[in-house]
Amino acid sequence: MDTLLHKDTIVAEWCDEIITRQSRENHNSLVGFRDRNRVVKHHIQQILDHLKGQNISKLAHVQDPKIAEALRTLIAWLKSNERFRPSTEPPLTDRQLEEAFSQLYLGDWAYVDRKYDDPVIPGQNFALFSFLPTVGAQPDADGVYGFLKIRGTFDRAEQAEDKARELIQYFTANTIKACKVGTPVPVAISQPSTEAIEIPPPKNGPFETDGPTDLKYQQLIQAQSMDEQKQIQEIYQNVEKLKEDVTKNPANKEPMQVYLELLQKMATCAWTYSQAQKTKDDMKSIILSDRLKLEEMDQKYPHLQNEYRKVYDEKNQQLGLDQCSDDMALGIRKYFGSRADLDF
């Protein structure tokens, strides 16, 4: 920020330097897409903080032409290069919604195809299917038997039912059949199998059930629901038993139970201690080895001792690590470049 405010600084060159640094920055797999372009974002934030300190909240109120030009340049670059740009458009008003609904025209409003495409289900983009026509089945003139649409895959039958009701209520006029993944299902107008059933549209809402088809569906999922309820009940019973054991007065416990608990506690602590000691020995070997390597590099490249700090601070600033205040970050910065007092 001080460089930008210097009287000899040319704004275009200052912005070009920042953008060049941004283009040279390498991202690894640990950098999320929201953290891209961090160099440009960092300098934009510095400018905004400077303006905030002057109680300026609008770009039109900026008096310094350098700051205004730099902010416009960096924001324009960020808009054209940012991968994630959430929409800032407000929702349609009642009047706009009425006009859009009556016209169904791709104009001033967003248009989404609900006749053929369902709403996207996160994490479900591709599916596998097989098709085998029955004996005597005939395709049309184009070789088409019909069309198949996969409406989603779910872990539990109840989830499939809820999604089917949502689709029927808001997005589709076609019947929806439920089936098991990996199991052959006959595709027919009248469905004889209980493994693939039709879910009717809800009468008064997406979650109401009524009628024989709903009863048929409930019979299909009843066994799974009962098994899940039994498992949940067993878990609750085990939790209560554990609570009783923990809250039980040691004086009321059987000697054998106390003896086993002490042995278990001692064995657990002994194993944890041995693992910690092993890790400590490994860390010590690494530190001693790296010390020798650094001493060799100091003799071969003596100038590195005077230059590494500046490069390290710049990298931290670019990556935003200089703003981290957790214990681990503070500890690493404390020991970086200095010989830690570790009794060896």
From Swiss-Prot:
Family of this protein: Belongs to the IIV-6 287R family.
User: What is the name of this protein?
Assistant: Uncharacterized protein 056L
Q: What organism does this protein naturally occur in?
A: Invertebrate iridescent virus 3
Judging by the UniProt lineage, the source's domain of life is Viruses
| Chain coiled-coil ranges | 221-249
Which Pfam families does this UniProt record tie to the protein? DUF5832 (PF19150)
UniProt keywords (A-Z) are:
Coiled coil
